[in-house]
């Protein structure tokens, strides 16, 4: 993908998205499918389009995304992060607006591991006094 493509990598939880954008008609293709087909829930589609709506480029770019790992919400967040980075690669003047909205910052929250002797990450076994 050489030429007039701009690239951004996005991450969220265990999902990783590789995003390529170029001037076009506003098509968003995720893993070979249209975004409306790939993300079944409306919230996922909304999350993906947020940086484009904020910058006013909703119909300006053709976007190709390769995303893997995690679940639907994590993948949507990773795609949003990747689109944000690709937009900054395209035009650095967009960074303050995107940063103000909180799209540039990588959400560092990850699932806490389960500990030995506990039921879950923090849930202990029930204590019996007698």
Swiss-Prot record:
InterPro entries: Ribosomal_Su5_D2-typ_SF, Ribosomal_uS9, Ribosomal_uS9_bac/plastid, Ribosomal_uS9_CS, Ribsml_uS5_D2-typ_fold_subgr. One of its GO terms (cellular component) is cytosolic small ribosomal subunit. Keywords: Ribonucleoprotein, Ribosomal protein. GO terms for molecular function: RNA binding; structural constituent of ribosome. Pfam families: Ribosomal_S9. HAMAP family: Ribosomal_uS9_B (MF_00532_B). Belongs to the universal ribosomal protein uS9 family. This is Small ribosomal subunit protein uS9.
């Amino acid at each position: 993908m050489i030429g007039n493509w701009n690239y951004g990598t996005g991450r969220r939880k265990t999902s990783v998205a590789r995003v390529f954008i170029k001037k076009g008609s506003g098509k968003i293709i995720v893993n070979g499918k249209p975004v409306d087909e790939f993300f079944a829930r409306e919230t996922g589609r909304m999350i993906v389009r947020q940086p484009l709506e904020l910058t006013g480029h909703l119909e300006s770019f053709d976007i190709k995304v390769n995303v893997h790992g995690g679940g639907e919400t994590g993948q949507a967040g990773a795609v949003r992060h990747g689109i944000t980075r690709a937009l900054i690669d395209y035009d650095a003047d967009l960074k303050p607006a995107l940063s103000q909205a909180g799209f540039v910052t990588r959400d560092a929250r990850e699932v806490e591991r389960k500990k030995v002797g506990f039921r879950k990450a923090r849930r202990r076994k029930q204590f019996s006094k007698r």
